[in-house]
Structures are given as C-alpha cells and as structure tokens.
Amino acid sequence: MRHKKHIFWLAAVGLFVLVGVAAATQPHPQTADVSAAFTADQVRSHSRTCTQDGNTFRITNAVWRGTATSAEPRLGGTLVISTRTVLNETTGDGWFSGTWRSKAPASMKPGKGGRPHANARLSGVIDNGNHLDGLATGQAWAPWARLLGNLSAVVNGTNVTGELGANSPVAPDNSALLYRGGC
C-alpha cells in the first residue's frame, strides 16, 4: 500500500514538472509591425565584370556602414550591411544577397539579452541599375523575436538609402514584422 502512494506522488510531481517545462518552452504568440529608415556609405567594395551573350555583368561585394532610425530599438542605431550584387549592366536588372546588422546606441540600457540588436539575411532584385527590392529574414534580441520584412533601397554612387517595412518608396504597403511563439 505504501509503495503505491509513493508511486502516485512521484507520478504527480513528474506530471507537474513536465507541464511546467512545456509551458516554459512555448511562449505565447506575439507580433509587432515595425519599420526602419536607413542610410549608409560604402566603406569597402570589390567588383569584377564578365560578358555573356552580349551582356556585361558586374559582380560586386560591398560593405556599407551607417545608421538606421526606428521606433523599435532593435532595428535602430548603428548599421552594417554587407552585399553581393550581380548586375546586368546592359539591361539594369540583377539580384543581390547579403546581411543586415543593427545595434542600438550604447546609451540604451542593456536588458537580459544585452543591448537591443538585430541580424538578418537579405535577398532581392535590382531594377534600373540602382533600385533594390527584397526580403529581410532574421532575428532580433533584447527581447528575442524573429524578423521578417520587405526592404526597398536606392543606391546613389557610394551611398544607399532605404526602408525596411515602410510605405515608401513603394506604396501601398512594404511590411515588416517581429514575431515569436506559437499555440
């Protein structure tokens, strides 16, 4: 009889622990619309060209440094964008891939995860030789969330200006979202 009581209590405690762990590992779903405007200057660049079927292609690896402005601290502050572009100089069309790294100013009080910051992978298309439209997918920290958003930018010489999740330069909607959790 005593042995059955011990097994019952052990099973009950084990069940409470299991339920507690399950509740702790799955945060409630959350979403937040976000946006950021940014400008950056090219600090490093390497290009090469090749010709194929009468078209000249320019392949460029570049690093851009600047600032991002956002009401969301994880997207604002110092910004480093690294890109690889392949541009058909004959037609002005091409594609790009790269990374976005933003970090809030040092004056921001670090939370549990440190200073608010975000990292994302970028990919998209180039139109008219200097207009970029693409997608940013990544994560933000302090607090943690996933990042998914549309990106639009214009390159003028060694400067890039654009927006992540804003209504311009392309209307009506160029959304970005921070999200986490599940049901």
Task: Pin down the residues of each PLM region.
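Bacterial N-terminal signal peptides that target proteins for export
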Residues: 2-10
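Beta-strand-enriched cores of mature, soluble protein domains
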Residues: 25-183
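Bacterial N-terminal signal peptides
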Residues: 10-19
